[in-house]
Amino acid sequence: MLHPATQQSPFMVDLHDQVHQGPVPLSYTVTTVTTQGFPLPASQHIPGCSAQQLPACSVMFSGQHYPLCCLPPPLIQACTMQQLPVPYHTYPHLISSDHYILHPPPPAPPPQPTHMAPLGQFVSLQTQHPRMPLQRLDNEMDLRGDQHPLGSFTYSTSATGPTLSPSVPLHYLPHDPLHQELSFGVPYSHMMPRRLSTQRYRLQQPLPPPPPPPPPSYYPSFLPYFLSMLPMSPTTVGPTISLDLDVDDVEMENYEALLNLAERLGDAKPRGLTKADIEQLPSYRFNPDSHQSEQTLCVVCFSDFEVRQLLRVLPCNHEFHAKCVDKWLKANRTCPICRADASEVPREAE
């Protein structure tokens, strides 16, 4: 029984599947396994490998690992296993429907001659791990020749298989599903419908309501001015209204504003004339023969003067019906025609 050395160097072995139509190169990954020995028949002799301890290696077909042989790096050229014929009908379950195919690396050196017996005479295959999709390697296999689909697998009609440079080490990849890709370059194809549905669900969500409008701004200079126009001061309103106002400053400001307004408006006068002021205005009976004014109608009622009608004369010498102009002067202090003050001339005459 062979015992592996303490220092193990991982490497890759190329297996070709023999079918009636030609050899079938399978996509596989060689990984190092736990230290163990493999019984070999006494009748089989491996040149250059019988006197040394060999590290263990394994072959993975479609996610399944199989122990194969023990070969140290110094004896790779003496004991090469690039082409090992395997009957196609012996392992039909290995040709699965996995869509994960390795991509080819740069070209390798020319093939070396085979120095070992067929695989079926001394290799015992056993399953170590459940099947899982192959993962992409940095050092990948070079598949050459005419490619023909066989079910969901791919085989070549060329007789010569690819070779592997002994100086390129291979590493065991952990089963990390984050780096799996399909053969046609679409990552996570089984997650795409769910991802699209999630985006559609996000698009269908209603938008949040708009924020409420801000409250109306407060103008502090308008309220004191409005309260100052009231007959009572803000301090006498009551305890329910508390205003942080400087009363002295507010009163001074309002007093100056009122003085400016009084200068522009002048002295305050009543709106109309009293009954006594109206009766002091001169009046007479209309006589067309003795009438000296050119005015023949009342502007208030737009009626012509008639005989024996009572007319009232304003200080501006405009004449009107007494009833019409008296009603007008109770609400206005000016003449309806020239807007002259009706109370100034009689007081000067007095």
Swiss-Prot record:
GO terms for molecular function: ubiquitin protein ligase activity; zinc ion binding. Transmembrane segments: none annotated. SMART domains: RING. Pfam families: zf-RING_2. A zinc finger (RING-type) spans 298-339. PANTHER family: GH10160P, RING FINGER PROTEIN 44. This is RING finger protein 44. It comes from Rattus norvegicus. The lineage of its organism: Eukaryota, Metazoa, Chordata, Craniata, Vertebrata. The gene is Rnf44.
